Design a protein with these regions (language model features):
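Active-site beta3 strand of CheY-like receiver
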Residues: 73-79
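Acidic catalytic/metal-coordinating carboxylates
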Residues: 62-65, 87-91
Length: 154
């Protein structure tokens, strides 16, 4: 063996099977747009969502803002309160569906009438949770939608 001080190392120009090896990249967090007209509700929901591998990429205080931010950011999941000023969640979802036809939408509301659930489904909702179940069921609903499943709890 030669003198280590005199040896040089040059990277090989021959490709090897290890050249393409890359460790598994961490899975990307779910980017969520959250719309509710009550700031305290948004703060609470953001806190809950951030405990998962979920990034709240935007918040909206009404349906009109939700439509604008959805168009701008193309989130992975949209969570909408049904009842908001300016433009409600149902109407916002109808507009969002025009340019994001496949993004999962999760609605929540104080009301859980069969008619409201049917309307939510008709505009393409993949999930619905009543507000009185949000603390217990929101993360379960988000996980279901992340896995391309539906979640209706009422």
């Amino acid at each position: 063996m030669g003198d280590p001080a005199k040896s040089s190392f040059a990277p090989s120009t021959n490709p090897s099977k290890f050249d393409s090896f890359q460790p598994d990249a961490p899975s990307r967090s779910l980017r969520v747009l959250l719309a509710d007209d009550h700031e305290m509700v948004r703060i609470g929901l953001c806190t809950m969502l951030q405990s998962q591998q979920t990034e709240v990429c935007a918040q909206a205080k009404n349906g009109e803002e939700a439509v604008e931010k959805s168009r701008e950011l193309s989130p992975d999941l949209i969570i909408l309160d049904v009842s908001m000023p300016v433009l409600g969640g149902i109407e916002a979802a109808q507009q969002i569906r025009v340019f994001l036809p496949d993004v999962p939408i999760l609605f929540y509301s104080m009301n859980n009438t069969p008619e409201l659930i049917a309307i939510a489904k008709s505009v393409g909702a993949q999930g619905f949770v009543t507000k009185n179940q949000m603390a217990a069921r929101l993360l379960e609903a988000v996980d279901a939608l992340r896995d391309k499943k539906t979640f209706f709890s009422f």
